[in-house]
Amino acid sequence: MFARQSLRVAQPLKQGFRKYSTEAPSKGKSSLAPIYLGVGLIGLGVGLYRYNSASAEAPPAERPKVFTGGDQGWVDLKLAQIENLSPNTKRLRFEFPDKEAVSGLHVASALLTKFKPQGAEKPVIRPYTPVSDEEQPGYLDLVVKVYPNGPMSEHLHSMNVDQRLEFKGPIPKYPWEANKHKHICLIAGGTGITPMYQLARKIFKDPEDQTKVTLVFGNVREEDILLKKELEELENTYPRRFRAFYLLDHPPKEWTGGKGYITKELLKTVLPEPKEENIKIFVCGPPGMYKSISGPKVSPTDQGELTGILAELGYSKDQVFKF
């Protein structure tokens, strides 16, 4: 699948003692004191060496976790920083009370967010996948695109620094282990890139993990491509193992990538064949994309049947995971 002709479909579709033992003793004075001193210093040195060696070999202390799951309940975090990524997308940084703590998330997992609109009877609860590293101490980052009539995304975009939001988790999605699959394919649309990036970053961060990754990422406009800088960095750092294909519904004139929706022809060209061993295809995006590519999930715990383009291409239900 990483042959040159396949990888270029997106165009246009596209790392002392001797002295003290031989000298004659002075009259009336003992010559043993220097020896005792030397032995003491050597003993001290051996002790320090053993202490330092033990310290170097000891595993680092485990950092406290903000989210522990189970019966923990909701955790209130303060918004510390806002970054505008595009006209409709922001990166929001929420800080932990303990600056040494980590989120407690694992790959792949998400968090629930909650707020209660004024005058509403029930709170709004929505899942989000942080884009910050799971081992990052002190804070977590969300990348949030605002959607019309989307109560949580509108609320998040209206927040100011020092305001607070409730979180709960982690919510497990797909348990990843190094080299669990030989080749994975990530089919994403819009903000569906967030769990895909979480997974890809985990793979390439681990020097023992040699998994190949193919990303197919669809968006409306070029400015809608979230995490483009981070994805390009992965491409440049791991050119033999990571390939990304971008498609736009409304591309600019100079655009050299794919145009329009993610099609059967494109996926047939860039994905590994269904008969290949130990592959996995992940799908995440808006409802229309699920319907076209894989069919929808029935519920958070029920993947539903595999339909759409992937079924037509011959992939099995076990080869596909819907975030």
From Swiss-Prot:
Membrane topology, record value: Single-pass membrane protein
Membrane-spanning parts: 32-48
Cofactor: FAD
Enzyme class: oxidoreductase
Biological process according to GO: ergosterol biosynthetic process
Alphabetical list of InterPro entries matching this protein: CBR-like (IPR001834), Cbr1-like_FAD-bd_dom (IPR008333), FAD-bd_FR_type (IPR017927), Flavoprot_Pyr_Nucl_cyt_Rdtase (IPR001709), FNR_nucleotide-bd (IPR039261), OxRdtase_FAD/NAD-bd (IPR001433), Riboflavin_synthase-like_b-brl (IPR017938)
Protein purpose: May mediate the reduction of outer membrane cytochrome b5.
Protein name: NADH-cytochrome b5 reductase 2
Gene name linked to the record: mcr1
